[in-house]
Regions:
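Anionic-ligand binding patches
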Residues: 2-9, 16-240
Length: 240
């Protein structure tokens, strides 16, 4: 790790996510995991929206270690299933988390649904917490910003409070970014790359599933790639 790199703790135990994030953020960042600081359990996610879960996970790491950090929460939303599996994507088939069984359950529930009606999207919300300047005067407080469950105002936009962010206890500043990827659910799994639902998700305008794309190809169009690119742009990188 070199001094000119910005160090961020990524609030996840999923090293596949870490690899994707590092591929987008580039060499100007050193990414660490909670496990690198001795925390080896899953980071809590107890809410009902991706936005709330991402914020919860980032705050958990911020409060535990006091280090600049970010968290993502990603869900697959299938229109004909009324947005399911959504925030339950990682545990769709129950505990413990089993990506293969999740995919099998999804395909069972879509049995008989024609391809044209299997529209879906991946949604990724990233919450970033950085140590702010002394005082953070003029920023909305966390309680003010969270009241009423105010939505992220747009893809990649900072959450309530605009570019200034939201002041957290302990001197942190919270900002939220969001990316989506539209597509369809395939009739059967295809491809060996990626993880999760990648083998059955065909991005809009493509004929391949995400599991058939290289990491660079995936990052260029994926929900997480878009959200990470917004995060990188905010953090001041010119090269993504």
């Amino acid at each position: 790790m070199t001094d000119n790199k910005k160090t961020l703790v990524f609030a996840t135990a999923n090293r596949n996510k870490l690899i994707e994030a590092a591929g987008v953020l580039g060499k100007g960042f050193a990414l660490e995991l909670p496990a690198d600081w001795g925390y080896t359990n899953d980071v809590p996610e107890t809410h009902f929206t991706s936005r709330e879960n991402a914020i919860e996970k980032a705050q958990f790491v911020w409060e535990m270690f006091g280090k600049d950090c970010f968290a993502d929460d990603t869900g697959l939303e299938v229109d004909v299933l009324d947005g399911a599996p959504g925030v339950y994507s990682a545990r769709y088939a129950g505990e413990p988390k089993n990506p293969v069984q999740n995919v099998k359950k999804l395909l069972r529930e879509l049995e008989g649904v024609p391809f044209a009606e299997r529209t879906a999207r991946f949604r990724c919300v990233i919450a970033l917490i950085e140590r702010g300047p002394e005082g953070c005067e003029g920023l909305p407080e966390e309680s003010e910003a969270m009241a009423g469950g105010e939505a992220v105002p747009g893809e990649g936009a900072a959450m309530a409070g605009g570019d200034r962010g939201i002041a957290l206890p302990g001197g942190g500043i919270l900002r939220v970014f969001e990316g989506t990827c539209e597509g369809h659910i395939a009739l059967e799994p295809q491809g060996e790359l990626g993880f999760g639902y990648d083998p059955v998700f065909i991005p809009e305008g493509m004929e391949k599933t995400m599991a058939m794309l290289t990491l660079d190809e995936k990052n260029a169009i994926s929900h997480r790639g878009k959200a990470m690119a917004m995060l990188a742009a905010y953090l001041g990188r010119d090269e993504l």
